[in-house]
Amino acid sequence: MPMTAVTNVPADAPLADELADEDLVEMANLPEEDTGIPGTIFVSTRMGRHGPCVKYFDGRAGEAQPSCSVTIADPPRVVANSLPDHVVSQRAPLVSAWVALNRDALLQFWNEGASWTRAEVSRFLDGLKRLKER
Protein backbone atom coordinates (compact mmCIF):
# COMPACT_ATOMS: atom_id res chain seq x y z
CA MET A 1 0.00 0.00 0.00
CA PRO A 2 1.71 3.23 -1.08
CA MET A 3 2.12 5.79 1.66
CA THR A 4 2.67 9.47 1.12
CA ALA A 5 5.25 11.22 3.25
CA VAL A 6 3.94 12.10 6.67
CA THR A 7 4.71 15.78 6.76
CA ASN A 8 2.66 18.79 7.63
CA VAL A 9 0.29 16.88 9.89
CA PRO A 10 -0.50 18.23 13.35
CA ALA A 11 1.02 16.71 16.46
CA ASP A 12 -1.01 13.81 17.80
CA ALA A 13 -2.95 14.71 20.96
CA PRO A 14 -2.00 12.77 24.09
CA LEU A 15 -4.46 9.98 24.85
CA ALA A 16 -5.23 11.54 28.23
CA ASP A 17 -6.54 14.68 26.50
CA GLU A 18 -8.81 12.69 24.22
CA LEU A 19 -10.21 10.55 27.04
CA ALA A 20 -10.79 13.50 29.41
CA ASP A 21 -13.93 14.74 27.65
CA GLU A 22 -15.59 11.39 27.07
CA ASP A 23 -18.54 9.97 28.98
CA LEU A 24 -18.35 6.35 27.86
CA VAL A 25 -15.67 4.78 25.70
CA GLU A 26 -14.95 1.14 24.95
CA MET A 27 -11.31 0.67 24.06
CA ALA A 28 -8.56 -1.89 23.71
CA ASN A 29 -4.80 -1.79 23.37
CA LEU A 30 -3.80 -4.40 20.80
CA PRO A 31 -0.19 -5.64 20.99
CA GLU A 32 1.89 -7.17 18.21
CA GLU A 33 0.52 -10.64 19.03
CA ASP A 34 -2.93 -9.42 17.95
CA THR A 35 -2.01 -7.17 15.01
CA GLY A 36 1.24 -8.51 13.58
CA ILE A 37 2.77 -5.02 13.93
CA PRO A 38 5.47 -4.16 16.49
CA GLY A 39 4.03 -1.74 19.04
CA THR A 40 0.45 -1.19 20.18
CA ILE A 41 -2.66 -0.14 18.29
CA PHE A 42 -5.31 1.60 20.39
CA VAL A 43 -8.86 1.09 19.11
CA SER A 44 -11.93 2.73 20.58
CA THR A 45 -15.53 3.62 20.09
CA ARG A 46 -16.38 7.14 18.92
CA MET A 47 -14.41 9.72 20.88
CA GLY A 48 -13.28 13.28 20.40
CA ARG A 49 -14.37 15.61 17.64
CA HIS A 50 -12.47 13.80 14.91
CA GLY A 51 -13.62 11.05 12.60
CA PRO A 52 -12.95 7.33 13.01
CA CYS A 53 -9.30 6.53 13.66
CA VAL A 54 -6.88 4.32 15.57
CA LYS A 55 -3.75 5.38 17.45
CA TYR A 56 -0.41 3.65 17.03
CA PHE A 57 2.23 3.60 19.79
CA ASP A 58 5.79 2.36 19.24
CA GLY A 59 5.74 0.20 22.38
CA ARG A 60 3.14 0.17 25.12
CA ALA A 61 0.29 2.65 24.89
CA GLY A 62 0.24 5.41 27.46
CA GLU A 63 -1.59 8.62 28.17
CA ALA A 64 1.47 10.79 27.49
CA GLN A 65 3.30 8.54 25.00
CA PRO A 66 4.05 9.73 21.45
CA SER A 67 1.68 8.28 18.87
CA CYS A 68 0.24 8.69 15.43
CA SER A 69 -3.42 8.63 14.43
CA VAL A 70 -4.53 6.77 11.31
CA THR A 71 -8.00 7.22 9.84
CA ILE A 72 -10.34 4.29 9.40
CA ALA A 73 -10.96 5.37 5.81
CA ASP A 74 -10.40 4.19 2.27
CA PRO A 75 -7.49 4.59 2.03
CA PRO A 76 -6.30 4.99 5.64
CA ARG A 77 -3.99 7.96 6.20
CA VAL A 78 -1.96 9.50 9.00
CA VAL A 79 -3.76 12.62 10.24
CA ALA A 80 -1.65 13.42 13.32
CA ASN A 81 1.79 12.36 14.48
CA SER A 82 4.11 12.87 17.43
CA LEU A 83 6.40 9.88 16.72
CA PRO A 84 9.93 10.28 15.32
CA ASP A 85 9.92 10.45 11.50
CA HIS A 86 11.84 7.18 11.09
CA VAL A 87 9.28 5.31 13.23
CA VAL A 88 6.21 6.66 11.47
CA SER A 89 7.76 6.06 8.04
CA GLN A 90 8.33 2.39 8.96
CA ARG A 91 5.11 1.73 10.86
CA ALA A 92 2.44 3.89 9.19
CA PRO A 93 2.27 1.69 6.07
CA LEU A 94 1.82 -1.39 8.29
CA VAL A 95 -0.82 0.27 10.46
CA SER A 96 -2.62 1.48 7.32
CA ALA A 97 -2.59 -2.05 5.88
CA TRP A 98 -3.97 -3.45 9.16
CA VAL A 99 -6.71 -0.81 9.25
CA ALA A 100 -7.66 -1.60 5.64
CA LEU A 101 -7.79 -5.32 6.49
CA ASN A 102 -10.13 -4.66 9.44
CA ARG A 103 -11.95 -1.52 8.23
CA ASP A 104 -15.53 -2.81 8.41
CA ALA A 105 -15.17 -4.21 11.94
CA LEU A 106 -13.30 -1.11 13.18
CA LEU A 107 -16.00 1.21 11.78
CA GLN A 108 -18.76 -0.85 13.35
CA PHE A 109 -16.96 -0.75 16.72
CA TRP A 110 -16.34 3.02 16.39
CA ASN A 111 -20.01 3.73 15.62
CA GLU A 112 -21.87 1.12 17.70
CA GLY A 113 -19.43 -0.39 20.21
CA ALA A 114 -20.33 1.87 23.16
CA SER A 115 -23.62 -0.05 23.49
CA TRP A 116 -22.13 -3.53 23.07
CA THR A 117 -22.05 -6.15 25.79
CA ARG A 118 -18.78 -7.62 27.04
CA ALA A 119 -19.43 -10.70 24.89
CA GLU A 120 -19.94 -8.55 21.78
CA VAL A 121 -16.72 -6.62 22.45
CA SER A 122 -14.87 -9.92 22.93
CA ARG A 123 -16.21 -11.24 19.61
CA PHE A 124 -15.10 -8.02 17.89
CA LEU A 125 -11.58 -8.26 19.33
CA ASP A 126 -11.29 -11.98 18.55
CA GLY A 127 -12.49 -11.37 14.98
CA LEU A 128 -9.84 -8.78 14.08
CA LYS A 129 -7.38 -10.07 11.49
CA ARG A 130 -3.65 -10.10 12.10
CA LEU A 131 -1.40 -8.60 9.42
CA LYS A 132 0.57 -11.37 7.75
CA GLU A 133 4.34 -11.26 8.03
CA ARG A 134 5.95 -9.37 5.16
Regions picked out by a protein language model, each given a short descriptive name:
Residues 2-56:
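Short, charged/polar N-terminal "headpieces" of proteins
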Residues 10, 20, 31, 60, ...:
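Serine/threonine-rich low-complexity intrinsically disordered regions
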Residues 14-31, 42, 77-79, 88-93, ...:
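Low-complexity, charged, repeat-rich alpha-helical/coil interaction segments
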Residues 29-31, 54, 65-69, 81-85, ...:
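Generic detector of ordered, mature protein regions
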Residues 39-93:
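A short, structured beta-strand/loop element
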Residues 87-133:
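Short, compact, well-ordered microdomains
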